[in-house]
From Swiss-Prot:
Residues 1-10 have a biased composition (Basic and acidic residues). It is found in: Nucleus. This is Dof zinc finger protein DOF5.8. The gene is DOF5.8. It comes from Arabidopsis thaliana (Mouse-ear cress). Zn(2+) binds at residues 34, 37, 59, 62. GO terms for molecular function: DNA-binding transcription factor activity; transcription cis-regulatory region binding; zinc ion binding.
Length: 225
């Protein structure tokens, strides 16, 4: 990019084949008005393609070049306008990157299907699903309501009541956590939400763990509610 000082020291070149005796036209040495900003702060630079009919000038106000007899280009050649165009392109690319990076793409969920089991009383249960745990959440509410009405107090179901196959006599009966005795009572004022069946058994209504700090194992205690 030629600077203003280098352009001022540049000597106009004489076209080839004209010889050294050809004088430079005097009209090119005058300061012409800029066709863009109409400023007179201009200067002659050189002849385009070594042709006297295409003198090239430079405007110090708008910092653009123009050639006499040629078309005015909108694309700036040198000057601060080129730097500003680079900044605008950088800003637009950064804005596009931020917009693309901020988009939230939905995650695809894979459905889980359980095989159909047998039908009990017109209700079809599925193996391995949540409905196999004592008939689902509605049956759990019915069972706790029945225990709170018939037993000494309501509470949570044990592992055996959920159909896990962990009956009495297994190691789940006695659990030691080494944290002393813990009892979780359940409110006995729960209301019956639905009609209960006759096959539901009554079991204790509290969780109780008792243990010592020096031993780790299973001791006697209630684990069902």
């Amino acid at each position: 990019m030629p600077s203003e000082f280098s352009e001022s020291r540049r000597v106009p070149k004489i076209p080839h084949g004209q010889g050294g005796s050809v004088a430079i036209p005097t009209d090119q040495q005058e300061q012409l008005s800029c066709p863009r900003c109409e400023s007179t702060n201009t200067k002659f630079c050189y002849y385009n393609n070594y042709n006297f009919s295409q003198p090239r000038h430079f405007c110090k106000s708008c910092r653009r070049y123009w050639t006499h007899g040629g078309t005015l280009r909108d694309i700036p050649v040198g000057g601060v306008s080129r730097k500003s165009s680079k900044r605008s392109r950088t800003y637009s690319s950064a804005a596009t990157t931020s917009v693309v990076g901020s988009r939230n793409f939905p995650l695809q969920a894979t459905p889980v299907l359980f095989p159909q089991s047998s039908s009990n009383g017109g209700i079809t249960t599925a193996k391995g699903s949540a409905s196999s745990f004592y008939g689902g959440f509605s049956s759990l509410i019915n069972y706790n309501a029945a225990v709170s009405r018939n037993g000494p107090g309501g509470g949570f179901n044990g592992p055996d009541a959920f159909g896990l196959g962990l009956g009495h006599g297994s190691y789940y009966e006695d659990v030691r956590y080494g944290q002393g005795i813990t009892v979780w009572p359940f409110s006995s004022g729960a209301t019956d939400a639905a009609t209960t069946t006759s096959h539901i058994a009554q079991i204790p209504a509290t969780w109780q763990f008792e243990g010592q700090e020096s031993k780790v194992g299973f001791v006697s205690g209630d684990y069902v509610a």
